[in-house]
Amino acid sequence: MQTHFVLKNLPFLLCSWCGDSSVGPYLKTEDGKKHKIYVIALIDDASRYIVGIDVFFNDNFVNLMSVMKAAVAKFGVPKLFNFDNGSSYKNKQMDLLAARIGSTVHYAQPYTPTQKAKVERWFRTMKDQWMAGLDMRDFHTLDKLRGSLYTYVSQYNQRIHSSLNGRSPQERYFSEPDCFLRLPEDKIDQSVVFPLTV
């Protein structure tokens, strides 16, 4: 189901997960080829907790779905996914996936960056902190780069955030366990398949 309303700040956990992608570092694989890397992330609007993230050679719908599936399996189902109008996000498959897991999708209006401000701000932080500290000569596989990113995200989630009244994103996210709507593993597997079918 697709919605068309203007998002305001959502203070409740699992009300909204905002997803986006960003160009990451360039990875030189063992065959000597240099590859552009994409980072796909999902952030909980209320807590700034990174619920899903991964690195890929391609920025596409299938890779986005894998991030969404892992996040839903681990952290529950948000009421709303907030995405931009890119082809990886705005399609019938996305609407079908959201409906299957009991969620909905909002697509940000063009040229309104405030609707995705938190995830875009997080990507800037990631680049300033994680990417700026990488020596890419140490990385030749996605798996190794992924491990480094996961370590950074874990540290970020546990650091006190200036907007959370002295709490970390992790503390804020897990402060309201009654908000979590969990799906059985078999339900997730049935709902998120490649490609989705009606």
For the regions a language model picked out, list residue spans one by one.
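Mobile-element integrase/transposase regions
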Residues: 1-41, 49-50, 61-67, 74-79, ...
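Residues immediately flanking
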Residues: 21, 45, 85
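Short small-residue beta-strand/loop micro-motif enriched in glycine and branched aliphatics
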Residues: 48-52, 106-108
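A short acidic/small-residue loop/turn micro-motif
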Residues: 56-60
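A generic secondary-structure signal for well-formed alpha-helical elements
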Residues: 72-75, 105, 126, 130-134, ...
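RNase H-like two-metal-ion nuclease catalytic core shared by retroviral integrases
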Residues: 81-85, 89-100, 105-131, 140-146
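A conserved active-site cap/scaffold subdomain adjacent to cofactor or substrate pockets
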Residues: 141-158, 162
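C-terminal, beta-rich DNA-binding module of retroviral/retroelements integrases
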Residues: 158-198
